Regions:
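RNA/tRNA-interacting regions in translation and RNA-turnover enzymes
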Residues: 1, 5-357
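Short "domain-exit" segments at the C-terminal end of structured domains
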Residues: 358-362
């Protein structure tokens, strides 16, 4: 049926499609009931909705007006569920993961666990080789002075950066995870963190003095300004990321104001590292700053994930046209962590369980 609905804000509609709610309905954002009323002396049987009233973040819809009615795509069919048309009809599962199961702090980890639980085949994501014919070693040098606190440090580089909003599908998945979309580069690092459970950080290459990265502890009494503009007092137990002249980040916690990504950035260094969990937990407490990254690091991450995660980020950068990936990777990994294997006697287990299901191939 047809209903008259008057907008509060000025809006030009020439056969356009809008999200509307009619008398007796409710807004998906806060459940407010929609009632028939009069606006400027004219009866209105409903309302036209903004993206916020539909329960969406306006950052996900850069074409939406600052305030006012959101115009739906022209191919939208009148009468369709607007929430579904905008891709907001989704199911989100929340898991309460105990601290000893850091392997499940990611989508891949949950998928692997579900495959084992329900006896399904787990297929890991396919990460393709990325990068041009250049060599990252011609651009950047990395040195780790404390391999106990940083057992692995991977770095890759991207030039000709093209900052833009990330695609809607990525924004929706991040929003469902409670992460606000920012731009394609930031969103990719957050997306990979949710996917692999591996935190990443991006540095502005042109702001790295000497075009080098040095991982070492701070000096007692050092003061460092983090990305949030706050000054943090350091001591010699706190691991820092440095360039050739200065500190540019608190390892595993937050980067510095002096190397942040700005809109005019052209070249970036992507860090994917493994830091000592206990040290990160104590450092976060000392500087009074706990982040999503530090929360993951302090549980104790698998260093073998670092390389695959940064390669996955570079793959997404190429697929989304966000920049040109420079060939090669810098991987400082002096003592490789081997898989732990537990020997067992399959015949004895079968005998004790009165079963023949296990064999030595397991």
């Amino acid at each position: 049926s047809l209903h008259d609905a008057l907008p509060i804000f000025p809006v030009v509609l020439d056969g356009g499609r809008v999200a509307g709610g009619h008398d007796g309905g409710a807004l998906p954002e806060d459940g407010i009931k929609i009632k028939k009323g009069k606006l400027r002396g004219v009866e209105s049987c409903g309302m036209m909705c903004s993206v916020e009233e539909l329960g969406a973040d306006r950052d996900m819809y850069p074409d939406a007006p600052e305030s006012g009615i959101y115009i739906l795509p022209k191919d939208s069919v009148p009468g369709e569920d607007a929430v579904a048309v905008m891709g907001l009809r989704d199911v989100v599962f929340e898991y309460e993961i105990t601290s000893n199961r850091v392997d499940c702090y990611s989508v891949i980890g949950i998928a692997r666990e579900a495959a084992a639980t329900f006896k399904k085949t787990f297929t890991a994501p396919s990460v393709t080789k990325t990068g041009n014919d250049e060599d990252i070693n011609d651009y950047l040098k990395v040195r780790v002075e404390n391999s106990r606190l940083c057992p692995r440090y991977c770095a890759r580089m991207v030039k000709n950066i093209r900052l833009a909003p990330s695609p809607r599908w990525m924004q929706r998945r991040l929003a469902a995870s409670g992460i606000r979309p920012i731009n394609n580069i930031v969103d990719i690092t957050n997306y990979v963190m949710e996917e692999y459970g591996q935190p990443m950080h991006a540095f502005n290459y042109d702001q790295l003095a000497g075009h080098e990265i040095i991982v070492k502890c701070a000096k007692d009494g050092d003061v460092f300004q983090t990305l949030d503009g706050q000054e943090r007092k350091l001591d010699s137990t706190i691991l820092m990321i440095n360039d050739g002249e200065k500190e540019v980040g608190i390892a595993g916690i937050m980067g510095g104001e002096n190397s942040k990504i700005t809109d005019d950035v052209t070249t970036m260094v992507f860090e994917s590292a493994c830091f000592d969990g206990t040290n990160i937990r104590l450092s976060a407490k000392k500087v009074g700053l706990r982040t999503d990254a530090s929360g993951k690091y302090e549980k104790g991450l698998d260093p073998n994930t670092a390389e695959e995660a940064v390669n996955r980020a570079c793959q997404l950068i190429e697929e989304l046209g966000a920049g040109e990936v420079i060939g090669g990777i810098i991987d400082i990994y002096p003592v490789k962590k081997e898989d732990k294997r537990i020997p067992f006697d399959a015949a004895r287990i079968n005998r004790d369980r009165k079963s023949t299901r296990l064999n030595s191939s397991h």
